[in-house]
């Protein structure tokens, strides 16, 4: 096939040649893949454990005669129950509450994380 370009070389030249000057030996433009069929619908269990228990404690005060606060029902570390904040505030709170009971290596790593986050929050951010 003397005098004609290979398919790959012609494909590369498509973008370089202006639209009005293109000839047929460069080939046709690549047609984007068009999906003809729809994917099968996913089967979702609407009553799994997580979805079934969503919002179960929302009105515990109304039904439970206001004896328990919803934060008392949260399971997790003591320094995180019913509290929200960023990572630096969370680490400082953890150090304040359980720092005296931590292993030396864990406390050292926590102090390193606090110093890094302190520098990070003071050097970068929206109001700098």
Swiss-Prot record:
Keywords: Mitochondrion, Ribonucleoprotein, Ribosomal protein, Transit peptide
GO BP terms in the entry: mitochondrial translation; translation
Principal location: mitochondrion
Location(s), subcellular: Mitochondrion
Any one GO CC term of the record: mitochondrial large ribosomal subunit
Keyword Ribosomal protein applies: yes
Pfam families linked to this entry: MRP-L51
Annotated organelle transit peptide span: 1-31
Disulfide-linked positions: none
MF terms in GO: structural constituent of ribosome
Family that this chain belongs to: Belongs to the mitochondrion-specific ribosomal protein mL51 family.
Quaternary structure and interacting proteins, as annotated: Component of the mitochondrial ribosome large subunit (39S) which comprises a 16S rRNA and about 50 distinct proteins. Interacts with OXA1L.
Protein name: Large ribosomal subunit protein mL51
Source species: Bos taurus (Bovine)
């Amino acid at each position: 096939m003397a005098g004609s370009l290979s398919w790959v070389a012609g494909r590369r030249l498509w973008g370089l040649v202006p639209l009005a000057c293109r000839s047929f030996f460069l080939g046709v433009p690549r047609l984007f893949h068009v999906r003809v069929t729809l994917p099968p619908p996913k089967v979702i269990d609407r009553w799994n454990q997580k979805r079934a228990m969503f919002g179960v404690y929302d009105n515990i005060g109304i039904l439970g005669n206001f004896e328990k606060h919803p934060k008392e029902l949260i399971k997790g570390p003591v320094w995180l129950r019913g509290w929200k904040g960023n990572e630096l505030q969370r680490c400082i709170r953890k150090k304040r509450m359980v720092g005296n009971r931590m292993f030396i290596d864990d406390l050292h790593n926590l102090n390193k994380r606090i110093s890094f986050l302190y520098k990070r929050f003071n050097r970068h951010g929206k109001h700098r």
